A protein has these predicted regions:
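Acidic, small-polar-rich N-terminal luminal/periplasmic segments of exported/outer-membrane proteins
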Residues: 12, 16-160, 262, 539
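C-terminal beta-signal and adjacent terminal beta-strands/loops
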Residues: 104, 502, 555, 560-561, ...
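Extracellular loop and loop/strand-boundary signature of outer-membrane beta-barrel proteins
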Residues: 110-111, 166-169, 216-221, 280-288, ...
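Transmembrane beta-strands of outer-membrane beta-barrel pores
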Residues: 150, 169-175, 188-190, 199-203, ...
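Periplasmic-side early beta-strands and strand-to-turn transitions of outer-membrane beta-barrels
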Residues: 154, 162-166, 172, 179, ...
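Face-selective signature of the C-terminal outer-membrane beta-barrel domain
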Residues: 238, 242-252, 291-460, 469, ...
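Outer-membrane beta-barrel signature, preferentially recognizing the C-terminal barrel domain
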Residues: 273-305, 416-422, 470-479, 483, ...
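Gram-negative outer-membrane beta-barrel transporters
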Residues: 363-365, 377, 435-436, 442, ...
Length: 740
């Protein structure tokens, strides 16, 4: 995979807004192409923009990207879900240097493994491909692709420099956070290397709730202690000017400790029971959540090959381990006659581990047939992944000391799916065909994927699911695409096409660990699950002038065979139990319009040199076609506008974020987040050679508003805890970076 270059951390800021349509991207076609030559909607965020916008997490990253939102859990688990055009979770493929980030998995109230595994201080650029992308990226690219590209030694060693050292310190008020990073790079005649070390710590992210109660009525954020660190190292050997061997070792660790005050208090009275009926009081709850990711990769890039089969070639082999561990310590008591009795300590632990080995290669070949030019791209991907998940726990009677491994309805330990191994193998080919000296581009592509699942029995699975058989699964999927770009006039172009997306049946749905004989229910495997699929159509118009650039696109995506987990089905004969199974049942449709652009006012009038503007908007509408209801995951109409003034050494921008009231709700009575408009003020100052100061004031007006990704689906309009899910009020972030 060819990787785009990024600005060095201390590069001076250009005057005026960069024309995003001239930016070179890779993810959409697996070749380096300007956005205006790509038959898809693609956006890129580079290191300079991340620094200028004080980006600290994935929500900050997409703050000014309408059409992309980030889901989160306000009570405890934080950010973990990137949604593109209303589709998120494991239906969006998230990559770091071409390697998939761990799946998300959650069950119940105490287990939630997210996908927020990337430390953005190790990243130099992020590319977002919107819409189905399985023709080049395979399974899970149903809704789109988010590709993180990490830093390289060459990003810092400019103009023949042999060494680079950099330090960065920052703070943010919304969570009383502080962070720092150190970067070192070196270069010899053939060797170069890079080391990046990061650390951050803070507290809970504030909201605008003011109820500090230690019970379910609480609206203030639960107290948290957050800490994390990461390491990125790269060693590059260049035996010649046109090839490089690269060894990458990367790791990250995050820990969050939470006093879950919002879960405390007296349980609700069961309807129909007298007020004196026994109830439960939760006296304390403490969460300790820990996640790690470690990666080793070896890659080889050849820019020039004297071969009839390829002009360039890239390949890599890798291993990546991701692990989430979440522990919960809860103390509770029974309430009888108004008195607390039988104090009990409950200890729970959730583990979700994903280990992947993989290899990939891609080759490129340029050739011509008459006056028609071709760029052929072809290659393969192979991944073997092992998934392990377990929930464990015990209950301790603090009066008698008795210990039990049963916390109803579970008899621990349990697995919610068996230990599973998957193999994914895909081959792809794409031809970028250029007619009339590139005025018209036709881009057909196709990919064939083979997916195999092999689950394993073990004592924990068999003990929790007695008599439940497990099933293997094998599926083959073909994903075509056809795109086109027509530069029909100077500065103007049309683009569009068709793409098919798919998601292989998840290991956690083929075999369900959902059996409890005491309560009379069980689950059966479904070896006949079909892949989830999407058919996406898009048409767009671009203008790329000297002073103004703009892009308008419309899309229509049809999804079918969405998998519903734990669906109640007819019981087999002689089975006196309620039976559940995952099945393909849901169909959905999402359509929408997106607009983005920018203006360099200095090109319109020299007296306005340094002034620029940017704007973007996204509107989507989605329906669950199975029951003709609006899709809950669709964000309302959102937009951003920014006006900036840049000089050689400093710059300032006023940016606005706007959202319309969310009106399309699947059920009456749900909370409809009101519309909002908030403004941010950003500034940067290169106050000395190799030294830069960034500062931002966010939500200048201290407005109370709700981010769509934070609002739980079951939240009602009459709820007394609406303010628990509000975004932070006015807050400040700042950083200073020096390098030499």
């Amino acid at each position: 995979m060819a990787l785009p270059a990024a600005h060095a951390a201390d590069a001076p800021d250009a005057s005026g807004e960069v024309n995003e349509l001239n930016r070179v991207v890779v993810s959409a076609t697996r070749t380096e192409r300007a956005v205006q030559d790509v038959p898809a909607t693609v956006s890129a965020i580079d290191r300079e923009r991340m620094d200028n916008e004080l980006t600290r997490n994935i929500r900050d990253l997409f703050r000014y990207e309408p059409g992309i939102d980030v889901g989160g859990n306000r009570e405890r688990f934080g950010l973990g879900d990137i949604r593109i055009r209303g589709l998120g979770g494991n239906r969006v493929r998230v990559l770091i240097d071409g390697i998939s980030v761990s799946d998300g998995f959650s069950i119940g109230s105490f287990s939630n493994a997210g996908r927020n595994f990337v430390d953005l201080d190790t990243v130099k650029e992020v590319e977002i491909v919107r819409g189905p992308s399985s023709a080049l990226h395979g399974s899970d690219a149903l809704g789109g692709v988010v590709s993180f590209v990490t830093k390289d030694p060459a990003d810092y060693l400019k103009d023949g420099a042999k060494s680079y050292f950099g330090l960065k310190l920052g703070a943010e008020s919304q969570n009383e956070g502080i962070y720092g990073s150190a970067t070192a790079a070196f270069a010899g005649e053939r060797w170069s290397g890079l080391v990046v070390v990061n650390h951050h710590q803070g507290k809970e992210t504030e909201n605008q709730g003011d109820n500090d109660a230690h019970d379910g009525s609480r609206t203030r954020a639960n107290p948290q202690s957050v800490e994390g660190r990461s390491l990125l190292t790269k060693l590059v050997f260049a035996p010649s000017a046109n090839q490089r061997f690269r060894l990458t070792v990367e790791g990250s660790e995050d820990r969050t400790q939470t006093d879950v005050f919002s879960a405390l208090g007296l349980s609700a009275l069961t309807p129909g029971l007298p007020p004196t009926a026994p109830r439960t009081r939760v006296l304390s709850m403490y969460g300790n959540d820990h996640q790690t990711r470690a990666r080793v990769a070896f890659a080889h890039e050849i820019d020039s090959l004297d071969s009839a089969l390829a002009d360039s070639l890239t390949w890599q082999v890798y291993r990546q381990d991701s692990e989430t561990t979440q522990r919960t310590r809860e103390q509770r008591a029974s309430v009888v006659g108004g008195r607390d009795t039988s104090p009990t300590l409950r200890l729970r632990e959730f583990n979700f581990d994903q280990r992947v080995y993989g290899a990939e290669a891609a080759a490129h070949k340029d050739f011509a047939t008459g006056s028609v030019e071709h760029t052929l791209t072809y290659g393969f991907e192979y991944e073997q992944t092992e998934f392990r998940q377990k929930r464990d726990g015990r209950s301790v009677n603090l009066t008698t000391g008795a210990v039990s491994s049963t916390i109803s309805p579970d008899a621990f330990p349990v697995r919610d799916f068996p230990i599973s191994k998957t193999r994914n193998a895909g081959v792809f080919v794409q031809d970028e065909i250029r007619f009339a000296d590139g005025a018209f581009r036709l881009v057909p592509a196709v990919r064939v994927d083979r997916y195999e699942l092999k689950p394993q029995n073990d004592a924990i699975w068999n003990g929790d699911n007695p008599g439940v058989k497990i099933s293997d699964l094998s599926k083959t999927s073909v994903s075509p695409k056809l795109g086109a770009v027509w530069h029909f006039a100077q500065d103007w172009s049309l683009y569009g096409g068709y793409q098919r997306g798919f998601r292989a049946p998840p290991y956690s749905d083929v075999n369900l660990g959902f059996t409890n004989l005491q309560f009379g229910y069980t689950a059966i495997p479904n070896p006949n699950l079909k892949p989830e699929t999407s058919n996406g159509y898009e048409l767009g118009l671009r203008y790329s002038g000297k002073a103004v650039y703009a892009q308008l696109s419309g899309y229509y995506n049809d999804y079918k065979d969405f998998i519903e987990s734990n669906r109640q089905v007819s019981a087999p004969p002689q089975t006196p139990l309620i039976v559940f199974q995952s099945q393909n049942v849901d169909k959905a449709r999402i359509r929408g319009v997106e607009l983005r652009g920018g203006v360099d006012f200095g090109e319109l009038d020299p007296s306005l040199a340094g002034w620029s503007g940017r704007f973007a908007a996204a509107y989507s509408k989605g329906e669950d076609k199975s029951d003709d209801r609006p899709l809950e995951s669709i964000a309302p109409l959102t937009a951003t506008v920014g006006v900036a003034y840049d000089r050689e050494a400093w710059g300032v921008e006023l940016a606005g974020r706007f959202a319309r009231r969310k009106s399309d709700l699947p059920e009456a009575g749900r909370f409809a987040a009101p519309g909002y408009g908030v403004f941010d003020l950003l500034a940067h100052w290169n106050f000395a050679p190799g030294a830069k100061f960034n500062v931002g004031v966010f939500n200048l007006g201290d407005k109370k508003y709700w981010d769509n990704g934070d609002v739980p689906g079951a939240l009602t309009a009459s709820s007394a805890i609406l303010d628990r899910y509000t975004a932070p009020g006015r807050n400040v972030g700042a950083s200073v970076a020096v390098s030499w």
